[in-house]
Amino acid sequence: MKTDRHKYNNDTYYVGIDAGSVSLNAVVIDSKKELVFESDYKRHFGRLNQELYALVEMLFSRFGESDIRAIGFTGVHGQALSETLGVLYEFETISQVLGVLAVLPNVKTIISMGGQDSSLFQIKHGANGWELGHFNTNGPCASGTGSFIDQQAERLATAMYEKSKNISQDQIDRVLGDFIQLGLKSDNPASVACRCTVFTKSDMIHLQNKGERLEDIIYGLH
């Protein structure tokens, strides 16, 4: 495998991997705690082990296996992977807050939307540092999470492109981008139920059948 190590000074590196329900993402910091690398957003489509192996191989090639001092995991699949590999693990909620504060020390509100969880953190800052003022997350229902929005983008693809379209897994990112951009064209969001994804989907189908503009339906969903 071709190496890209010439891009980095000789140093020691620390890798954090978010093994989520939908995607696999990684960041690398150096000994000065400076961010030196962030991987592209990568959907694993259930092929978690294969995608993880490819990701780690790429990181070893780029930074040098001997120069990577530690690897840590977070995310839905992070704990199981960390136990299997004998490496560090941190709860995703803690990782999200500490990670954002490291990049934006004065942040007051953090919203995390994952494949199956959405979370809200409100941070209070004072003379003695920061503290968590409020936290909330969704329950067992996946309403308002990334997976449901993905599903609706795929479902509406035929209407969006005005022709029958079979969406491959590799095309979903482009479809999702078009889905979001179409919704941004609306200035009149349709009324869509926010209680549950079952009701939300039913409302969206009903609005389509009534002839509501697609961009208004998508904007209402968001």
Predicted feature residues:
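Glycine-rich phosphate-binding loop plus the immediately following alpha-helix
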Residues: 47, 125, 131-184, 196
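Adenine-nucleotide phosphate-binding core of ATP-dependent small-molecule kinases
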Residues: 200-222
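Active-site nucleophile and cofactor-binding loops and adjacent substrate-binding regions
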Residues: 43-45, 70-73, 87-98, 111-115, ...
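Short beta-strand-loop/turn "lid" adjacent to the catalytic site in phosphate-handling enzymes
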Residues: 40-44, 60-93, 121-122
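Gly/Thr-rich phosphate-binding beta-strand-loop-beta motif of the actin/hexokinase/Hsp70
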Residues: 2-33, 107-126, 196
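Short glycine-rich, Thr/Ser-proximal phosphate-binding strand/loop in the N-terminal lobe
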Residues: 11-54, 131-139
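Residues on a specific face of well-ordered alpha-helices
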Residues: 50, 54, 98, 102, ...
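Short acidic, glycine/serine/threonine-rich loops at helix termini
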Residues: 27-30, 81-86, 119-126, 133-136, ...
